């Protein structure tokens, strides 16, 4: 899940 900084699941 992208919290707005790093694109991660």
From Swiss-Prot:
Tissue: Corpora cardiaca.
Leucine amide sites (modified residues): 9
Cellular component terms (Gene Ontology): extracellular region
One biological process term in Gene Ontology: neuropeptide signaling pathway
Record key words, sorted: Amidation, Neuropeptide, Secreted
Keyword RNA-binding: no
Compartment(s) of residence: Secreted
Described function: Mediates visceral muscle contractile activity (myotropic activity).
Domain of life: Eukaryota
Protein name listed in UniProt: Pyrokinin-1
Family to which this protein belongs: Belongs to the pyrokinin family.
